[in-house]
């Protein structure tokens, strides 16, 4: 799709995974930035970590109202805006070939093709999102995250920032106040919806 966007003259792409939840304002906000590559941060499902990787030696990240722009080592593509200039720079610098022209379909430039890199006396097989980031950094581009964006990652429930910073408290028993007032919306279980 990135190759097709370049061929058709689009100025940017916005990659959004089907399991992301966000306010529409997040789209305009990520498009507003001048940096060629900007990601939104979101939690891994079931883990206390973000899907993107921060530049070492990042020790602290402010999110939401206290957030801003910060550089990443690797960006997950669940909410990622890439400007045309970034694709062109990566293709030229990394000498990426135009593939599959012989089939008569839209050709493919392998921006996201998985790659293996050396890592701490071993090897690391990168998925397509981290491979794109690796190629971008090798091409001299910086990858940024807008840490003000509030994104939710759908899984067993909607994972948010809180899942990265805190353990969800699980309990053996729970008492929930139920409402008998039919005029107030409920969650469908009879339990009150939080204000």
Feature map (PLM): residue ranges:
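Conserved catalytic core of nucleotide-sugar-dependent glycosyltransferases
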Residues: 2, 23-115
């Amino acid at each position: 799709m990135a190759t097709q966007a370049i061929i058709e003259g689009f100025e940017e792409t916005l990659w959004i995974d089907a399991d992301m939840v966000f306010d529409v304002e997040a789209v305009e906000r990520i498009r507003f930035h001048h940096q060629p590559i900007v990601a939104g941060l979101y939690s891994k499902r079931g883990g206390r970590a973000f899907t993107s990787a921060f530049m070492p030696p990042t020790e602290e990240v402010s999110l939401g109202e206290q957030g801003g722009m910060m550089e990443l080592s690797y960006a997950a593509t669940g909410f990622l805006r890439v400007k045309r200039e970034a694709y062109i720079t990566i293709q030229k610098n990394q000498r990426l070939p135009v593939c599959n022209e012989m089939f008569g379909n839209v050709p493919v430039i392998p921006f996201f093709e998985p790659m293996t890199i050396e890592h701490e006396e071993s090897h690391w097989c990168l998925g397509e999102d981290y491979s794109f980031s690796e190629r971008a950094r090798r091409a001299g581009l910086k990858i940024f995250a807008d840490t003000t964006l509030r994104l939710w990652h759908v899984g067993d429930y909607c994972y948010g920032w809180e899942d990265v910073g805190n353990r969800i408290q699980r309990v053996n028993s729970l008492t929930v106040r139920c409402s008998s007032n039919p005029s107030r919306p409920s969650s469908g279980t009879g339990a009150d919806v939080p204000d």
